[in-house]
């Protein structure tokens, strides 16, 4: 029986490259030279932005988003927290989200069921497995999910016949 998985994954190397590009861009910017820094923690996939003022944090966040887009990483996976003061400077944390949580998985399953397609969707941890009798039904399910807007970028992998 044909099936595929709906997942939300990040390419760790591309994320690292995007952060490195943002750091280089920050060094090139005359208005931000020496006034801010990015600190990427690979272990928990977070970026700590540090700057003297809040408007500089906003500019740095925009630099990071542009670097992500250039590396073809969807910016919906970037979750930013509110800036907070730390001594003489301001800090802001940005976390890269990965995996499908239960609420999003339920929305995906509901979307597939509301589409009245001849497929079944089952939640399996941080992914949703979609099975059907024909490959065409699965392709319709993929097309349906691509038309909908979710708060996380979705990828479709493990397509089996």
From Swiss-Prot:
GO terms for molecular function: nucleotide binding. Disulfide bonds: none annotated. One of its GO terms (cellular component) is cytosol. Keywords: Nucleotide-binding. The keyword Nucleus does not apply. The keyword Magnesium does not apply. Belongs to the YajQ family. Nucleotide-binding protein. HAMAP family: YajQ. NCBIfam families: PRK05412.1. This is Nucleotide-binding protein PputGB1_4497. It comes from Pseudomonas putida (strain GB-1). The lineage of its organism: Bacteria, Pseudomonadati, Pseudomonadota, Gammaproteobacteria, Pseudomonadales.
């Amino acid at each position: 029986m044909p099936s595929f998985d709906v997942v939300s994954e990040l390419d760790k190397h591309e994320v690292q490259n995007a952060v490195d590009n943002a750091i280089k861009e920050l060094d090139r910017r005359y208005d931000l030279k020496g006034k801010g820094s990015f600190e990427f923690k690979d272990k928990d996939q977070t970026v700590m932005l540090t700057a003297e003022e809040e408007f500089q944090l906003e500019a740095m966040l925009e630099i990071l988003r542009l670097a992500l887009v250039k590396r073809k990483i969807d910016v919906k996976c970037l979750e930013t927290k509110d800036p907070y003061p730390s001594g003489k400077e301001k800090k802001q944390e940005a976390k890269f989200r990965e995996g499908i949580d239960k609420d999003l998985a339920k929305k995906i399953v509901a979307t597939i069921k509301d589409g009245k397609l001849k497929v079944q969707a089952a939640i399996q941890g941080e992914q949703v497995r979609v099975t059907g009798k024909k490959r065409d039904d699965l392709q319709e399910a993929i097309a349906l999910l691509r038309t909908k807007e979710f708060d996380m970028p979705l990828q479709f992998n493990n397509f089996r016949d």
